[in-house]
Amino acid sequence: MFQDNPLLAQLKQQLHSQTPRAEGVVKATEKGFGFLEVDAQKSYFIPPPQMKKVMHGDRIIAVIHSEKERESAEPEELVEPFLTRFVGKVQGKNDRLAIVPDHPLLKDAIPCRAARGLNHEFKEGDWAVAEMRRHPLKGDRSFYAELTQYITFGDDHFVPWWVTLARHNLEKEAPDGVATEMLDEGLVREDLTALDFVTIDSASTEDMDDALFAKALPDDKLQLIVAIADPTAWIAEGSKLDKAAKIRAFTNYLPGFNIPMLPRELSDDLCSLRANEVRPVLACRMTLSADGTIEDNIEFFAATIESKAKLVYDQVSDWLENTGDWKPESEAIAEQVRLLAQICQRRGEWRHNHALVFKDRPDYRFILGEKGEVLDIVAEPRRIANRIVEEAMIAANICAARVLRDKLGFGIYNVHMGFDPANADALAALLKTHGLHVDAEEVLTLDGFCKLRRELDAQPTGFLDSRIRRFQSFAEISTEPGPHFGLGLEAYATWTSPIRKYGDMINHRLLKAVIKGETATRPQDEITVQMAERRRLNRMAERDVGDWLYARFLKDKAGTDTRFAAEIVDISRGGMRVRLVDNGAIAFIPAPFLHAVRDEMVCSQENGTVQIKGETVYKVTDVIDVTIAEVRMETRSIIARPVA
């Protein structure tokens, strides 16, 4: 009798619409219960039985129940699942398989089976890619996943690399394909094979994409020719190789090895500016005045060169600093090194006075054994030879930015707008509390930004600099010329790494159109989106592999008295993140390790400080001594403890 009763249906509808609901993200805990986080201020308790319907990170709508002053959430509807495609470790064998996602907060095994057509007999410990197929909030009885790709076996020494590349859906090897002959581009190539061009790189570098030649001119001027490898002489726009490079967008540099954007035959051989080999190049000739200004007679042209020497950063630096036993093989090469050092000095001073110079941070290099084991991690400071190449490349990129802007009005530009205008007042207020007075309007201009950066660089510590970082906007890739506040430049367009950056290949094609006096087509905005996304994924992959290798490297230091100097990089409610100075590893110090009585301590992300009993004891950028308390291999996290 109640079956089709409209009154009952209406009552049900009414009850449903009157029941309080909330949308938010599920946060799991290690104790079985969880929370529905609605926003930064509001969260609801999810009891353990209800947590079985959801997964950490799911965005859901839940019914809110109130009992005896206590509110709890009952998951009702899935808005967006946290897991769709993921990597994990297989448990069980044959017919009864499950997979544990490789995520610090997902501990439960999800029942699964191999997808049809996947010819692999999965066993305990295998790594796999899986896709979620069932979810309790979608009307299914339980969670269920399908294994879509076998990654590798559990004991493979190279798990960090293969799992990370699979997680981010990135290529594992160089692209296929060969370039048989150079294209006829209708370019006249200037023969510069007699000039003493040199390359300066790491000893192990095979993909040399820049060579330099310097010459003294009258009136204390210097000429610099930057010659860049010319892959677009081999790769036609729209060809199979070009499309593959467009998707990859960059060479992916991971600790221990790289996955090139172009076939190795091109990147490490045909295009690489090897010593004593004739190579086609795209070149830029510029004149530097006595104070390092780039004069207006910038000239881009096609050429052939023959590098006369493959020089190595450390050897060149040693020689210029009068240490070590290496010396250039001839006086002609020695003269090149001296002139290039002079150019570096001038350009460095010019940028210091008229633009901005980054503080030197060391590069950290993993030294790996045959089986991927970490033998050592060394900090490689940026020395004079690194700066010679850096200054030459920055100068060449400034030239390209100007020429493309003035001749075409577009290109692939690196743009950074400094501070987000919405943050200008908050920024000025924060600086004022530290005794620095800035105008909220002026700081949004290039000159105002540079002025502030110079004041910050003159501070005794980097603390204030770290506080204002959150107000900055991100660097972007744009087809429209625009300023790069971070470098303090009106425009910046890279073209000096076409073997490893697709955007530089595009700029090569545009510069060639300028050289030939032809019209060029503006690159589509989609390409900048693809490049930005690939850059993000490559960086995440590099970080993930690094975390894994750091955990391996420091595992035997856990629980020992070995001390490490560590810089505080971030402070949150839960504790502090630090970077070990000697090797670059990131470790976490939980708040209870800082002070036993929680109520006497305030950890403030906003202020970048830890106060104990009202006294500031730690602040971001402080360097402290720590020991390694624990290394958790399953989450690749390093827990440190301050030395008392």
Curated annotation (Swiss-Prot):
GO cellular component, one term: cytosol
Top-level taxonomic group: Bacteria
Keyword Cytoplasm belongs to the record: yes
The entry's keywords: Cytoplasm, Exonuclease, Hydrolase, Nuclease, RNA-binding
Domain S1 motif: 561-643
EC number: 3.1.13.1
GO molecular function, one term: RNA binding
Gene Ontology process terms (BP): mRNA catabolic process
Family annotation (SUPFAM superfamilies): Nucleic acid-binding proteins
Every RNB domain range: 189-516
InterPro entries: CSD, NA-bd_OB-fold, RNase_B_OB_dom, RNase_II, RNase_II/R, RNase_II/R_CS, RNase_II/RNase_R, RNR_Ribonuclease
Protein's cellular compartments: Cytoplasm
Catalytic activity: Exonucleolytic cleavage in the 3'- to 5'-direction to yield nucleoside 5'-phosphates
Family, similarity comment: Belongs to the RNR ribonuclease family. RNase II subfamily.
PANTHER family referenced in this protein's UniProt entry, alphabetically: EXORIBONUCLEASE 2, RIBONUCLEASE
Function: Involved in mRNA degradation. Hydrolyzes single-stranded polyribonucleotides processively in the 3' to 5' direction.
Name of protein: Exoribonuclease 2
Organism: Escherichia coli O9:H4 (strain HS)
Upper lineage: Bacteria, Pseudomonadati, Pseudomonadota, Gammaproteobacteria, Enterobacterales
